């Protein structure tokens, strides 16, 4: 299987990603990638630098975004959930930019789009269900206002609701919706999400897409991301470097673009589509 990284953040993901688009492209080429998707938080400001770098290095650029989404545009203070969106072609790139523009116009602080927005401008786009901060994932494991399912009945109800959401997405985007599984085996919630998505894929036929949610190009860059987190709202009140490292220092070998990309454990033995599930990439 030829792996392509489809969920990638550069320094344009403010106070979260580290490394220039060129550094990420250089690292991708070192690892043998033929293409790379950059999905900044809520913006496409790296697109020009990314395209220029990818062309220089000789890999295919895939333009995307990790969007902030909300159920409606009525309350700008409501909780935001993540959704991974990729442009497949020129129409998709145009619609991606339309979505980003609208998301900045209709919200303050965090540019936010609704499901209706994504559906309206969905032509040429591929949608991944998102990371552990997505609406579907939070339904499954709790977080962002969702209670952690404790009983078997609660867990089953959450699973059924996620199944209904996934099938709606699959119907709207007609073969261009994927369940996103990620390779963080040390994170319990991610293991639970992956297992649920693998089962859901088996039951519904909705394909899986394995991603790495990369935030810096090399393992040794982990400490810089810790510093970036400490500078943001999530670092408020953490006075020492030791405290920042304790909270944010995830295992480096599973939180950076890897020397060896092993996605075989992300889906509990269930098959991900060739080239991470996205034909044409």
Predicted regions and their residues:
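Phosphodiester-processing cores and adjacent nucleic acid-binding clamps
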Residues: 1-263, 274, 278-281
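Short, small-residue-biased leader/transition segments that mark boundaries at the very start
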Residues: 266-272
């Amino acid at each position: 299987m030829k792996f392509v990284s489809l969920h990638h953040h550069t320094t344009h993901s403010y106070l979260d990603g580290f490394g220039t688009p060129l550094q990420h492209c250089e690292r991708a080429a070192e690892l043998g990638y033929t293409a790379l998707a950059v999905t900044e938080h809520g913006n496409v400001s790296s697109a020009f630098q990314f395209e220029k770098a990818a062309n220089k290095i000789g890999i295919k650029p895939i333009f995307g975004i990790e969007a902030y989404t909300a159920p409606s545009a009525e309350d700008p203070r409501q909780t935001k959930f993540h959704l991974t969106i990729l442009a497949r072609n020129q129409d998709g790139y145009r619609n991606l930019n339309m979505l980003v523009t609208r998301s900045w116009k209709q919200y303050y602080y965090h540019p936010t789009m609704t499901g209706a927005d994504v559906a309206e401008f969905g032509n040429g786009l591929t949608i991944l269900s998102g990371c552990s901060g997505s609406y579907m994932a939070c339904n499954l494991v709790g977080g962002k206002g969702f209670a952690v399912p404790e009983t078997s009945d609660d867990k089953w109800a959450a699973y059924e609701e996620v199944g209904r959401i996934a099938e709606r997405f699959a119907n709207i985007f007609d073969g261009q919706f994927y369940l996103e599984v990620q390779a963080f085996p040390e994170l319990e919630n991610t293991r639970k999400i992956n297992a649920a998505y693998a089962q859901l894929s088996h039951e519904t036929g909705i394909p899986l897409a394995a991603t790495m949610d990369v935030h810096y190009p090399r393992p040794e860059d982990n400490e810089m991301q810790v510093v970036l987190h400490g500078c943001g709202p999530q670092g408020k009140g953490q006075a020492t470097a030791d405290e920042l490292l304790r909270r944010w220092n995830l295992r480096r070998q599973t939180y950076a673009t890897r020397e060896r990309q092993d996605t075989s454990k992300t889906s509990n033995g269930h098959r991900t589509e060739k080239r991470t599930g996205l034909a044409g990439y």
